[in-house]
């Protein structure tokens, strides 16, 4: 049974596609590609059908990550097929939990940086790099990479628990 993760930011052109690309690479490197699917979406549909921001694509490519992406808006009906919904900041977390049709679905929503032990008790938001320069995208990637290690460990535990 496939474990499904969806990363969510505002417009699905910067942070969430970056998190999706990094996490997919981690999943493949861990040999879990046949068991875990990663996807992304935005809380809004302003960029629906567009590719990722060119700065996101450039930073990912410079760090060896691939990305084939078309932006889309998160839909309430997706909760039923997802195991984990990963929000990139507290605003997304609140919006997604409000959208969740059940308490069980709301419990599926977590902040990405909550998986990074280095920020325990600190600011768990991944800042939106959209209005800044390349440095903001590099910083975003660093945060995503740091949290992806803990996220992979948590997902691996869930996947192995299902197999037991």
UniProtKB/Swiss-Prot annotation:
Active site: 9 (nucleophile), 15, 128 (proton donor)
Keywords: Hydrolase, Protein phosphatase
Primary enzyme class: hydrolase
UniProt xrefs under Pfam families: LMWPc
EC number of the protein: 3.1.3.48
Gene3D superfamilies with a match to the protein in the record: 3.40.50.2300
Catalytic activity entry: O-phospho-L-tyrosyl-[protein] + H2O = L-tyrosyl-[protein] + phosphate
GO molecular function, one term: protein tyrosine phosphatase activity
Stated role: Acts on tyrosine phosphorylated proteins, low-MW aryl phosphates and natural and synthetic acyl phosphates. May be involved in the regulation of sulfur amino acid metabolism.
Protein family: Belongs to the low molecular weight phosphotyrosine protein phosphatase family.
Protein name: Low molecular weight protein-tyrosine-phosphatase
Protein's organism: Streptomyces coelicolor (strain ATCC BAA-471 / A3(2) / M145)
């Amino acid at each position: 049974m496939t474990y499904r993760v969806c990363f969510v930011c505002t417009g699905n052109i910067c942070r969430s596609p970056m998190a999706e690309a990094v996490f997919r690479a981690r999943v493949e490197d861990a040999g879990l590609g046949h068991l875990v699917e990663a996807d992304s979406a935005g809380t809004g549909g302003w960029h629906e059908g567009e590719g990722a921001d060119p700065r996101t694509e450039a930073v990912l490519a410079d760090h060896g990550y691939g990305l084939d992406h078309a932006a889309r808006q998160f839909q309430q009906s997706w909760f039923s097929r997802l195991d984990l919904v990963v929000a990139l900041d507290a605003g997304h977390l609140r919006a997604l939990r409000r959208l969740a049709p059940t308490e069980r679905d709301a419990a599926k929503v977590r902040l990405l940086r909550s998986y990074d032990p280095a920020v325990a008790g600190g600011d768990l938001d991944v800042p939106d790099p959209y209005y800044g320069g390349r440095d903001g995208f590099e910083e975003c990637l660093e945060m995503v990479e740091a949290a992806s290690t803990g996220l992979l460990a948590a997902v691996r535990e869930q996947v192995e628990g299902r197999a037991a």
